[in-house]
Amino acid sequence: MATYSILYWQEIPSQVKAEDALDDMTLPLDPKFMERIDRMAAQRGLQSTDDYLAQWRWSDPQEREGSAEAVAHALKAELEAAADW
């Protein structure tokens, strides 16, 4: 069993983190997610560093069957497949 969280900039995911008793793993999502975040920040007028950084948050931790590595890779694939932009 692994515990995982997703790092979001507003509603856009950017990274997954999973940990179990033996390991922890953090994976960034495809670069298109950061490109989207940067575009949205510019469109929303969040140009100061403080305004930009204030938009980041981790989701509440959740549990999922599997090792930290397996869960992190599965979440990354699911989030990337779900992106419809």
For each of these PLM feature ranges, what is it?
Residues G45-W85:
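Acidic, low-complexity intrinsically disordered segments
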Residues A21-W58:
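Acidic, aromatic-enriched beta-alpha/helix-loop junctions
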Residues M1-D24:
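Short, charged/polar N-terminal "headpieces" of proteins
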